[in-house]
C-alpha cells in the first residue's frame, strides 16, 4: 500500500495535556482498550525519576496516562517480553525501530503472532543509558540529575527540563565526542522511522503553529489504516493533512540522521573496530554469566546449546570463543542492533559491536536486513522453525 500521512491529535483534553505532541499515540491505545480490540497495552511508565522506566501491561484505559510521554534514558526491549509472557494475548505496543525489528524477526520464527499485535512505531533518534545520563547531566549541565523532571532529544541537542521549569541543552555531538550521549549502538543505527509497524509516529515534520500540538503519523499497513480511520470516526482523534513543507523537513531529518548513523557506523565498525588482539583481551574477560544470551530479543531456542558446560569441570575461565562463537553462528544473521547484550555485560565487553559488524557483512553479501525484509534469515534456509 502507498503510505498515507497525517497530523493527528487526541480529542480527550486530559490526554492532550499529558501526552506527547498532541497525545495521538495514547489516544489510539485508549481506543483499542475501550473497544476491547486488545487485552492490554504494553508500555513504559516513569518510576521514581526520568531514569527509571517500569514496563507495565495496562488493561484499563483509565491507567493509560501513566504511560504518556517519552523516556529516552531508560532503554527497554519489547520483543522478548512479548515472546515470553504475552504470546497468547492481543496487545498494542509502542515500538522503537529496534523493537519493531525484533518483533518482526520473532514473528518469522513463529514466536509472535503479528495478527495479535498492534505496533505503533516511534521515530527514534536514540536512547541514553540511565547511569550515563546522570553522569553527563552533572558534568555538562552542572545541575543535580535528581532535579530533572523531563528530557528530550531535539534538533541534535539533548534538552533537560528542571523542577523550576527552566531548560538546559547541549549539542549531542559535544556529548558524544566526550564519551557520553546516546548508546553506541544508537549512534550507528540505520533505521529511524519504524515503517514495519502499523503506524509510524513522531514530531518530525510537524511545523509552525501545529508544532507540539499534533503528532505526525505515517500509516504503514492496512491494519494501521483501519485503526486510525475507526478511532477518528468514534471521536478519539482528529486528523488533518500535513503541511507540505513539513513533509520535506521530515524527509530531510530522516536523511540527515541516517547519514549520521552511517558516519558513526564507519567510526565504530571500521576506524575504531578492535583488532584481533584487542578482541582476545575482551573475550578473556567473559565469565559466562549468560546475560547477553538471556537479554537478546531474537534468541528464542527452548533448549539452548550454550546451557551445558562448554569446558571441563574445574577449568577456568571458560572458553569465550566457543561461547560467543556459538551465539554468533545462531544470531548474527538476525542482529537488530538493539545493544541490549552490551548493556547488560558486567565485564563491559562491547558485544554488540561484533554482532553488528557480522550482520553488516551478511547484509552486504546477501542483502538481508533483519526485521525489515519480509523473508526468513538466510541462516534458516528460508523456513522458520516453530520452536
From Swiss-Prot:
Q: Which residues form the 4Fe-4S ferredoxin-type domain?
A: 275-298, 326-355
Q: What is this protein called?
A: F420-dependent formate dehydrogenase 1 subunit beta
Question: What does the subunit comment say?
Answer: Dimer of an alpha (FdhA1) and a beta (FdhB1) subunit.
> Which family is this protein grouped under?
Belongs to the FrhB family.
Q: Name one Pfam family in it.
A: FrhB_FdhB_C
Keywords in alphabetical order: 4Fe-4S, Electron transport, FAD, Flavoprotein, Iron, Iron-sulfur, Metal-binding, Oxidoreductase, Repeat, Transport, Zinc
* A molecular function GO annotation: oxidoreductase activity, acting on CH or CH2 groups, with an iron-sulfur protein as acceptor
Q: What else is known?
A: The genome of M.maripaludis harbors two sets of genes encoding the F420-dependent formate dehydrogenase (Fdh), fdhA1-fdhB1 (Fdh1 isozyme) and fdhA2-fdhB2 (Fdh2 isozyme). The Fdh1 isozyme is the primary Fdh and the Fdh2 isozyme may not play a major role.
Name of the coding gene: fdhB1
Q: Which cofactor does it need?
A: [4Fe-4S] cluster; FAD; Zn(2+)
The reply on keyword Thylakoid is no
Instruction: List positions binding [4Fe-4S] cluster 1.
Output: 286, 289, 292, 345
Name the chemical reaction catalysed here.
oxidized coenzyme F420-(gamma-L-Glu)(n) + formate + 2 H(+) = reduced coenzyme F420-(gamma-L-Glu)(n) + CO2
Q: How is the cofactor bound?
A: Binds 2 [4Fe-4S] clusters.
Q: Is Hydrolase set as a keyword in this record?
A: no
Amino acid at each position: 500500500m502507498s503510505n498515507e500521512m497525517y497530523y493527528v491529535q487526541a480529542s480527550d483534553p486530559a490526554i492532550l495535556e499529558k501526552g506527547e505532541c498532541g497525545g495521538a499515540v495514547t489516544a489510539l491505545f485508549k481506543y483499542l482498550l475501550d473497544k476491547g480490540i486488545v487485552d492490554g497495552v504494553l508500555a513504559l511508565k516513569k518510576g521514581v525519576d526520568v531514569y527509571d522506566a517500569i514496563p507495565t501491561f495496562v488493561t484499563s484505559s483509565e491507567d493509560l496516562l501513566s504511560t504518556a510521554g517519552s523516556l529516552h534514558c531508560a532503554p527497554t526491549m519489547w520483543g522478548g517480553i512479548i515472546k515470553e509472557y504475552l504470546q497468547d494475548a492481543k496487545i498494542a505496543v509502542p515500538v522503537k525501530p529496534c523493537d519493531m525489528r525484533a518483533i518482526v524477526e520473532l514473528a518469522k520464527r513463529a514466536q509472535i503472532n503479528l495478527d495479535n499485535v498492534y505496533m505503533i512505531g516511534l521515530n527514534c533518534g536514540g536512547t541514553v543509558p540511565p547511569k550515563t545520563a546522570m553522569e553527563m547531566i552533572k558534568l555538562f549541565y552542572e545541575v543535580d540529575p535528581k532535579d530533572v523532571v523531563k528530557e528530550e532529544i531535539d534538533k541534535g541537542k539533548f534538552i533537560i527540563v528542571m523542577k523550576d521549569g527552566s531548560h538546559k541543552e547541549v549539542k549531542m555531538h559535544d556529548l558524544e565526542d566526550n564519551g557520553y550521549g546516546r548508546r553506541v549502538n544508537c549512534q550507528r543505527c540505520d533505521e529511524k522511522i519504524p515503517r514495519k509497524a502499523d503506524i509510524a509516529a513522531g514530531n518530525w515534520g510537524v511545523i509552525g503553529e501545529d508544532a507540539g500540538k499534533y503528532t505526525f503519523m505515517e500509516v504503514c499497513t492496512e491494519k494501521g489504516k483501519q485503526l486510525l480511520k475507526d478511532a477518528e470516526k468514534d471521536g478519539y482523534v482528529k486528523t488533518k493533512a500535513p503541511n507540505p513543507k513539513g513533509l520535506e523537513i521530515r524527509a530531510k531529518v530522516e536523511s540527515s540522521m541516517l547519514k549520521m548513523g552511517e558516519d558513526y557506523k564507519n567510526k565504530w565498525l571500521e576506524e575504531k573496530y578492535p583488532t584481533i588482539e584487542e578482541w582476545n583481551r575482551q573475550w578473556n574477560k567473559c565469565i559466562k554469566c549468560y546475560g547477553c544470551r538471556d537479554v537478546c530479543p531474537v534468541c528464542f531456542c527452548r533448549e539452548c546449546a550454550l546451557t551445558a558446560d562448554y569446558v571441563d569441570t574445574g577449568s577456568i575461565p571458560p572458553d569465550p570463543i566457543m561461547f560467543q562463537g556459538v551465539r554468533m553462528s545462531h544470531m548474527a544473521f538476525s542482529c537488530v542492533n538493539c545493544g541490549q547484550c552490551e548493556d547488560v555485560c558486567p565485564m563491559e565487553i562491547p558485544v554488540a559491536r561484533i554482532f553488528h559488524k557480522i550482520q553488516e557483512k551478511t547484509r552486504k553479501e546477501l542483502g538481508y536486513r533483519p526485521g525489515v525484509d519480509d523473508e526468513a534469515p538466510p541462516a534458516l534456509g528460508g523456513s522458520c522453525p516453530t520452536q
